[in-house]
């Protein structure tokens, strides 16, 4: 919607006129505009190989996470930091019922859940992003895709998550030997 794009652009410049020290994101997840200080992506890929195909092997200007364009007509990537602000979204199959859901096919158990989380994080770290945020920490209402359930009980042994360390080298995240 061109009106919404115009509104987002106007708000970007109004915000910048009031405070030039802070980055402004005009849209989070997809349909980014030229007037933005960061490019953000939401993508609930099933596995890390999908991240490779979309974000290492392809042009960021042409990717379509979750069926949405990454940039609106005429806008393009101009070297801004890229933040992967939502990925993961894994539900346990036993929880994804009665109106509750996650993204894609649910994990069959705690071991598969852990393995998929680990592989997605490793995949993200291979991509040329400056930051990422896993979706999500806890289950929230009908979204049962958290690392913890709604009572904050872990869905798997979380002690291994600390081993997913990041080594920063030249703008790319590299996997550290586990």
Predicted segments with their positions:
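Catalytic metal-binding/acid-base residues of hydrolase active sites
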Residues: 1, 20, 29-30, 44-45, ...
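Active-site neighborhood of glycoside hydrolase catalytic domains
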Residues: 1-38, 79
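Short, charged low-complexity intrinsically disordered segments located at boundaries
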Residues: 3-4, 8, 42-46, 150-154
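Substrate-binding clefts and catalytic carboxylate motifs of secreted carbohydrate-active enzymes
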Residues: 13, 52, 56-178
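A cross-family glycoside hydrolase active-site/sugar-binding cleft signature
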Residues: 25-27, 42, 85-86, 135
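Short, well-ordered secondary-structure micro-motifs within conserved domains or adaptor modules
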Residues: 33-45, 49-53
């Amino acid at each position: 919607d061109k009106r919404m794009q115009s509104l987002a652009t106007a708000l970007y410049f109004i915000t910048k006129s009031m405070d030039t020290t802070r980055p402004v994101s005009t849209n989070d997840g997809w349909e980014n505009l030229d007037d933005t200080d960061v490019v953000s992506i939401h993508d609930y890929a099933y596995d890390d190989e999908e991240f490779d195909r979309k974000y290492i092997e392809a042009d960021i200007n042409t990717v379509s996470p979750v069926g949405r364009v990454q940039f609106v007509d005429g806008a393009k990537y101009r070297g801004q930091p890229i933040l992967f602000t939502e990925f993961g979204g894994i539900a346990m199959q036993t929880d994804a019922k009665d109106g509750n859901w996650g993204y894609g096919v649910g994990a069959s158990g705690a071991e598969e859940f852990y393995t998929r989380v680990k592989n997605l994080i490793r995949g993200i770290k291979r991509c040329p992003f400056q930051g990422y945020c896993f979706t999500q920490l806890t289950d929230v209402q009908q979204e049962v895709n958290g690392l913890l359930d709604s009572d904050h009980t872990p869905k798997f042994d979380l002690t291994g998550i600390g081993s997913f360390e990041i080594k920063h080298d030249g703008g790319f995240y590299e996997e550290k030997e586990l």
